[in-house]
Structures are given as C-alpha cells and as structure tokens.
Amino acid sequence: MNSMRFSLLDRTTQNSVISTTSNDLSNWSRLSSLWPLLYGTSCCFIEFASLIGSRFDFDRYGLVPRSSPRQADIILTAGTVTMKMAPSLVRLYEQMPEPKYVIAMGACTITGGMFSTDSYSTVRGVDKLIPVDVYLPGCPPKPEAIIDAITKLRKKLSREIYEDRIGCQQENRCFTTNHKFRVGRSTHTGNYDQGLLYQSPSTSEIPFESFLKYKSSVSSHELVN
C-alpha cells in the first residue's frame, strides 16, 4: 500500500535488529494508520459509512476514526457547509496537530453544489475556509472513490516525507576543518610540564625525618604567630 521505502528501515544487524530514526518511525506509522476526523453535514457522509462494512473494510487501511481533533491526522468534510457552521469547521482544523490534511468529499463541499446558486447561507467551496489536499467529486462519491482518495493522500505523504528528508540532509551537513595542535609531553606517566603547571612533591617522596622536621617547624611557627 505504501509506495515509499525507508532506506534506514532496511538496515538490519545479524540479530535482526532494525536501526532507524525517530522521524522515520513516526512517518512510517502515520502512513500505516491515518486517524480521520469525520465532519459530515449532509447525505455524502452516508457513503463513508459504507466503508465500515465487511465489503470494503476500512480497518485494513489503518483508518481509526477519532472524535477529538487533537488526535486526528485528517479531517474529512462531507456535505454542505453553511455560514453558521464555517467557524466551527475552522476551529476544528486549527485544533488539529501538525501535520494535518483535508479531504473534501462531494460536490456540495467542493463547490457548494446545487445550493450555491440561490442560497445566501452556503459556502461556495470549503477551500475558502481551510486548505484542501484531496478533492473527491461526486454526488455522492462511491466508497471505491473514497479508498482511492486515501491511497492518493498516502502517496502525497510519502512524497512529502522524501522531500523533507532530502532537505534535512542538505541543511544538516557536517563540515570539518583542520586544526593545528602543538605536540606536548606525554601525560600518561604523570610527568607534567613544570613550566605550565607546578607540581609539589608528594609526601611519599619526602624522607620521614625531613617530614618530622618540617611539621615541627610549621607548628612552632604557628605558636609564635
């Protein structure tokens, strides 16, 4: 169903572990399961209900209808959109998270249909309110046409994902430059450069008698002060 192949998903190790990026994983899951928000106001919406049956079985396409716009990827408008319902439609679209897509289903949604000639309260096309990605003409469109529209939307998503990947690869390039380092003394043995860093002798290297004389002189100096 998905015409886009993700090259990073093909990289497998000997233990059959797939290595990929989070963006490719989210895009792959979005292509496999689109969550539509059904916005039906007229008779065209009845044709979408035919997809629920066993003949077309829209579950095999990964469609999971959602009742909240904050959980939806697609808003599917079907039927006549009036001036009174226009603010509600725009508000639902604005509440959807990015990326979001719109499918205009039916002649009444696309152009206003037969109500656009003499009705003062009908919106002449839903694309005057929100951007439309797929137009689905018909009065009403058949369930086969709805499946074809979803398939075309998936191809559109695949193309956008590929273009985004190419853009990211061109923008996020890594450039290297040569730096000149001064080779100093090896620090693995603990012999630091005395000119740069002063290292006091440790107490283990001082003889025990000299150490006692040093302590007694320090203590007497403290008593005098």
Curated annotation (Swiss-Prot):
Gene that produces this protein: ndhK
NCBIfam families linked: nuoB_fam, PRK06411.1
Lineage: Eukaryota, Viridiplantae, Streptophyta, Embryophyta, Tracheophyta
Protein name, per record: NAD(P)H-quinone oxidoreductase subunit K, chloroplastic
Keyword annotations: 4Fe-4S, Chloroplast, Iron, Iron-sulfur, Membrane, Metal-binding, NAD, NADP, Plastid, Plastoquinone, Quinone, Thylakoid, Translocase, Transport
Alphabetical GO biological process terms: aerobic respiration; electron transport coupled proton transport; photosynthesis, light reaction
Location in the cell: Plastid, Chloroplast thylakoid membrane
Primary localization: plastid
Entry EC no(s): 7.1.1.-
PANTHER family given in the database record: NADH DEHYDROGENASE (PTHR11995), NADH DEHYDROGENASE [UBIQUINONE] IRON-SULFUR PROTEIN 7, MITOCHONDRIAL (PTHR11995:SF14)
Residues that, per the record, bind [4Fe-4S] cluster: 43-44, 108, 139
Pfam families named among the record's database cross-references: Oxidored_q6
